Structure formats: C-alpha cells, structure tokens
Curated annotation (Swiss-Prot):
This is Polymerase acidic protein. Pfam families: Flu_PA. Gene3D superfamilies: Influenza RNA-dependent RNA polymerase subunit PA, endonuclease domain (3.40.91.90). Its EC number is 3.1.-.-. Keywords: Cap snatching, Endonuclease, Eukaryotic host gene expression shutoff by virus, Eukaryotic host transcription shutoff by virus, Host cytoplasm, Host gene expression shutoff by virus, Host nucleus, Host-virus interaction, Hydrolase, Inhibition of host RNA polymerase II by virus, Manganese, Metal-binding, Nuclease, Phosphoprotein. Its cofactor is Mn(2+). It is found in: Host cytoplasm; Host nucleus. Binds 2 manganese ions per subunit.
Amino acid sequence: MEDFVRQCFNPMIVELAEKAMKEYGEDPKIETNKFAAICTHLEVCFMYSDFHFVDERGESIIVESGDPNALLKHRFEIIEGRDRTMAWTVVNSICNTTGIEKPKFLPDLYDYKENRFIEIGVTRREVHIYYLEKANKIKSEKTHIHIFSFTGEEMATKADYTLDEESRARIKTRLFTIRQEMASRGLWDSFRQSERGEETIEERFEITGTMRRLANQSLPPNFSSLENFRAYVDGFEPNGCIEGKLSQMSKEVNARIEPFLKTTPRPLRLPEGPPCSQRSKFLLMDALKLSIEDPSHEGEGIPLYDAIKCMKTFFGWKEPNIVKPHEKGINPNYLLAWKQVLAELQDIENEEKIPKTKNMKKTSQLKWALGENMAPEKVDFEDCKDVSDLKQYDSDEPEQRSLASWIQSEFNKACELTDSSWIELDEIGEDVAPIEHIASMRRNYFTAEVSRCRATEYIMKGVYINTALLNASSAAMDDFQLIPMISKCRTKEGRRKTNLYGFIIKGRSHLRNDTDVVNFVSMEFSLTDPRLEPHKWEKYCVLEIGDMLLRTAIGQVSRPMFLYVRTNGTSKIKMKWGMEMRRCLLQSLQQIESMIEAESSVKEKDMTKEFFENNSETWPIGESPKGVEEGSIGKVCRTLLAKSVFNSLYASPQLEGFSAESRKLLLIVQALRDNLEPGTFDLGGLYEAIEECLINDPWVLLNASWFNSFLTHALK
C-alpha cells in the first residue's frame, strides 16, 4: 500500500500527509491505510479548489488555461494541509475580516463567494452515515459539509453542492480510479474495512473481552450491542422526540423536554426573616491581635508563655462590663468567665515556674458555659425498649434568615492584603525536570500573590486553633483547659511576630466517635462595636474590657476594646478538617493553573511568566449587581483563595446541597450561553432542590445572591 500511495499521488501531497501523520505521532509505513486516506482527502480538497476563481465583481468563474492577464482571486482558501498553527492563523484572520463565527474544529476550505467554511469528507462507507458523524462532531450550523464516496455518491448540507456538475464529476472520477487501482492490487478490501468513524479517543480504544461483555450487558433494553447503541446515540436528533425515546427505553419514565431559553430561568428566591448572624468558629475581619515582634522571651513558642507575653503589651485594661448581652444566655456568667481568666493568668505569673498548660478551676460559670452535666442522661436501650410512647425529640424547623450585608464585607476583607506575610516561600531543592521547574515557578508566583492575603491569615489561624483544640481534647479530656488563640507571621521587614487573638476554654472531651462534640467558650479581642450590627452578633455576649490607643493620621485616639464571648462546639472530624485548611491554598492554585494551561495551549507555549507579570491585563473575578467585576491576576488568586477558605470556615449541609444543586442550573445556563440549545424537564424540581438549601446560612445566602447576579448578566 505504501508503494501504491507514493506512485499514485503527487509528491507534494505525499509529503504533506507524512508531515500530518508525524504531527500526531503516527507512522506512514505502519498505518498505510490511514496514509492512503489522508492523501485522498488532501487531493480532493485541492481538486475542489482547482480552477475556481472570483473575478472583480465577486462572481465565480472557472479558468482552466493559465491566462496570465486575468486579475483573479482564488475562490477557495485551502486550510487542510497546513500545520495547525498556520491553519488556525488563517482561520482567525478570515473570521476577523469577514465577521464569520469561528469554528470549533479546523475546517478544510473557506469559500470566499459564499462566505462560509467547508468541511470535506471522503468515505468508504454510506455517505449519509458519514455525513451524520461529521455533523455531530462539528455541531455548527455555519460550516458547510460536503461528503464524497468512492462509489460516486455525494451528500452536502441542504443539498447545496457548491461546485458545478463538471468539477464534482472530476472528483468522483478520480476517487473511482483510485478505488480500481487499489482493487487491481488487492488493496481495496483492507482499505475499505479500515475506515473508522469520525475519530475520538473512545473510538480508537478497542474494548475487548470481559469489558466488551459488560458493555453489551449494561445497555438500555432494545439494544443488542454497543455498536448499535453508539450508532443510535450518534444519529440522535435532540429536538422533538426525546419524550418518545425515553418512553421506549423505560415505561417508568415520563418527561416533557422544555426548551431552556433566555427567558426561562427566574432568580433564586432568598428567604425573608431577621438578618443572618455570624457563625464562624472564630472572629474574622473583626478580630484584634495583641502582638510581640521578634519574640525572644523564655519559653518562646510555648503557647501559654507567648500569650502572657502578648497580654503584657497592653496597658489599657479596665473593669469589664456587658455592652451587648446574649439574648438567651446567662450573661453575668460570661462576664465572670472573663474575670476568672484574668485572675488565673495573674496566678500563673505569681508562681515561680510558669506551667506549660493551664487548666481552669471548674467554677459554676464555666460549668454553665461549657454545658457540664447538661447532656441528658444516657439510658441503656434494654431498660427502656418496652416504654410504649418512646419517641425522638421533636426538633424545630430552623428559622429562616435573610441575607445581611456583613457577609459580603467579610468576603471583601478576606480578599485584601495585610501588612504581614502568613506563609513562608517553601525552600525546595533544585528542580530536576522541566515540568518541576514550571510547577515551582507557578507555586512561587502564586505564593507571592497570596502570602499576605487576609484569607491566608484565616487559614493559619484555623490550623492553629483546631490543632491546639484537638490536642487538648485528647490530652486533657476531663479538664477545662485554657487554650490561647495564637498565630505567627513576618512583618514587611521580615521580622517574626507572634499574635494573640484571645482564648478558648474547652469543656469535657471524651471524643470516641468522629462526630462527638466538644464544647468550648471563645473569648476574642475586637475593636468592633457590636451595637453597629447587633444582628451579626446574635450568638455572642460582648464585653467592653479596655481602651486602646491607636495611631492615626490626626494623632493618637483612644478606642474602646471589646471582648466577644460565646459558647460553641466542634467535633473530631471538624477539627481534623480544620487542621487541613492549608489545602485551600492548593485548591485555588489548581484553579489558577487551569487558567494558565488554557492560555498556554492557545499560545502553544508556557505562559506562566506572562500571566503573572503582565500587569495591564485584567481578568474576570465574579459577578456583582454592577456587572462582571475584573481585576489583576493577584486579585483573582486572592478571590479564589478566599472562596475556598470560606467554604471551609462556613462548611455546612446547606452549602453542600446548594453547591451540588445550583451547579446543575449553572451548567444549563452555560450550555445556553454556548448556543447548545439545552432542554430541561422538571426545572421546578431543580429550583425546589436549590431553594430548600437557602435557610439561614450567611455564606450560602451570599452565594445565592451572587448566583442571581450571574443569571442576570449571563442572560442579557
């Protein structure tokens, strides 16, 4: 066959075919049938274009003798046979000059007279089967398809054959000649049988043996083999008969497919009710730190020593009083708990040697705050299984809450830069492979963009608190241990800094199962006056505990310092995940990496450096009521990181449900934007599934409101 190809086809065509095969890693000496098919296809494309010109008036004319005086332009631009980069360049420039829609796949020709791209097919099978495969693959109304067969049949979009009868007859005659030449050498049968459908990876992948039997067994009823099913799916016409097809497949299914148009979707209904409240395990934007720079005190690194040292940097303590009571709690107990912490810290200092950990006295206020002896008594099932009216507690439906503006402010704050660095640039050995070099370059650029981000501070704070709490829960199960909330960072000048946010006191923690709860009381410093947004602090009792002098542009001002106190709880599994919060960095790095990959594949070279260093370019960050928000690549990194961190801080069943269900609607809207004419059934049911997750969670409500902004702009 290889010899035949080299004799039968023009050397230029043979050379182009060899080049094309090598580009895809195929060997013309081994895949000889494919070699022949590519040469045939190239020759048909060239013959299609030969002798066809457009004159000065744009009329199509055929000129066979080479009249050198004619000022003529070729009617067809040949795209097939060029290397990929060049071919796309040609396609792009045609699209730019003519305004025609850019095709998803490289077409074979462009027709200047009809202003359309043409896909040429040459098949050894039935023309209509091959036509359907082509149409299914390119899925574009705009590209014209023209199929020829070796038996003299042809098929074209809307039976519009583009060329005159004679030109097409020339092509058919040539194909017939090739077939006869092959047959006379005994090559035709193998060539005819070797044709596969429009190749996709799956189709080249032969399924055999057990897998083949499993595939044939797992088909819907009425299909005998995978081939049948595949042919059926490929020729599937989406509009009109899905309902019938569904009912053929199963009697149980009854669905009317409704077209999904720009006017179809409605916004998500957000719940009404009082504004939602803060529910994170620690304060975020409202946190205040007492810090020491370049710590070098005795016992540096032991949390209790660090905490006492930080407390000593502040001189404005005063008699605490309650400024915002907790609606349901016994507020004086919160006040007494704080006074007890101060007193016991004072006691430690009076001792000769400061202990490494501090267990609080089990006072009545702490027992109350930590729910000691509050759990209902457990009774063995054997003793009560005969009780006739044994039933589970009735639990109330959660009260609906409306979206409050504070959660958007929290998110904005999380995307901002602080003046400290919260993660170190990892010192990693020399890169061995080029891919490692690219990977570490990306990681370093990314780290530089996010190391000072507030969301990164939240990660390190979360990791520290969860680690300390889990350790204490295992090491001191019965004790009310005092756990300082600490983080470490570096200043702009590179000096180390230790920060104290407040304290946690943990309750009894006999955690046998992953979901067993340990109660804790958190006490956190803040300069935020809770009376400005009382709804945000519904779960807190807030004390005023001191006055802090702040340096401002107009000199020193004194601001009241508050302590946010609340009872909270967590479980082993939540703490384990909290300790893993650094994964948020990885998740957002991967999202950025896929953006770089997309850019690199278009430009056909690694774009990492340009991506991070081209400051003029802006990228879409998210949707807001104003429209699509854009920002620098650093802002994109920080926004993606903040989203990932908030998913961790505000993790909940409501978020799980909302993410899973809203994603389905998102995909349908994306399909509509990509002109894929999506259809849906039971859209109402999907809305119900999404909206049943919108109850009272601030992060879920914010995401739902973003989703509504997206719908508005996506469907304009």
